[in-house]
Amino acid sequence: MTYEAQSGPVEALRDITFGVGRGEFVALVGPSGCGKSTLLRIVAGLRPPTAGDVAVDGSPVTRPIAQVGMVFQAPVLLKWRTVLDNVLLPAELAGLEAKRYRGRAHELLQLVGLGGFEAKLPRELSGGMQQRASLCRALLLDPPLLLMDEPFGALDAMTRDEMNLELLRVWGEGSGGAAGSDRKTILFVTHSIPEAVFLADRVVVMSPRPGRIARICPAGLPRPRTVEARASADFGRLALEIYDLLTARPA
């Protein structure tokens, strides 16, 4: 993937090839500027690749598609709309009758602990609550693939840990979440090695720009994940392996 900058062509990604299985949780880690966010935008159909191709469910991605939901680092909630109306926005943008999705919107908000906040404005919510609303919005049309671009990066450490557990619960690791084959496929970008190891089935480690795959590391940790998993020897070994890959200097 090459794009034009003021200083000339910039190669953001090179020779990226990997697949993600249905219902799998895959994390992407790498140094700043290695193309992680660019890769997500290509998968989402927001940016066309300059070489190669991307497919979702076997179909090439050439434009934004309904099968993909996206959550950004900032919640990007419209400040003049209520929480409920923000969650319903994807239905409106897709030309669908929003009132048909009100029931699902209420269910999602209840699932993430925002029941009773439907009529609130974004400014009345904490950062973590805003990000919960953003997650509900991405899930409204029930996309099988969820792309998450550092969604918890701006949160404090304790709220971030809470959101990690909340995400796993919604994904299907706890009561009330999806089960088995109903789980979403998630591609999750983060700068946090512990977050990647805690959440993912596999961690894709990327090299500096142009971003390439340095290694794909299976997490190998049992599910459901618990807070105690962070203290396990296997967790520490994998986190250290990824850290060594990211800090390795070329010979």
Task: Map each language-model feature to its residues.
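ABC family nucleotide-binding domain
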Residues: M1-P194, L199
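Extended, non-globular alpha-helical segments
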Residues: A239-A251
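Active-site/binding-pocket entry motifs
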Residues: T2, P222-R223, A248
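Short, glycine/charged-rich "phosphate-handling" switch motifs in NTP-dependent
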Residues: R202
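Conserved beta-strand-loop-alpha-helix hinge in the C-terminal portion
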Residues: M206-L238
